[in-house]
Amino acid sequence: MKDIQDYSSIYLFFRTNGKDTLVEVNRKNSISSTNWIFHIDKRLPLRLVVPEIIKLQAKKEGSAHKSETSENYFSYSDSVHKNLAFIPFTKLQFKLTSPKSDSIVYFSKNGDAFHKLKNNTAATGLGFDKNMSFEEYIQYKIAIQQLNLQNVSEAEFIY
């Protein structure tokens, strides 16, 4: 995805308070009838990022002014093409629990991937370590997108 028109930028900033890591959300520019581009500090862990994304998705869905054609995108710096690139995630449903499915690929913070796949027709779920940085998450998302996998669930599990 290269060019997005009619969008609102949403920023999630990295902040600290003593030894605590915090996320600061700048949602003042979020217009529910537009496409939303999420610019997220790569140092933030998923355990802080995902609850904020869930809240913002719910706000957009509940708006009387939402557009049925508007999308949500993560932005990232594409170092190969030297530009800002986007990953769509409008249909993605984040779950803050471990999956009940028998078909899951789990990506850990230390770079390991574990899979438990059954020979069935159920969609394969993706799971991510809640302590993984957003940068690591985006790197996995880019790799998964390039594989053009079929039958991947629209739910992602962060645990």
Regions inferred by a protein language model and the residue ranges of each:
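Long, low-hydrophobicity, acidic/polar, solvent-exposed interaction domains
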Residues: 1-159
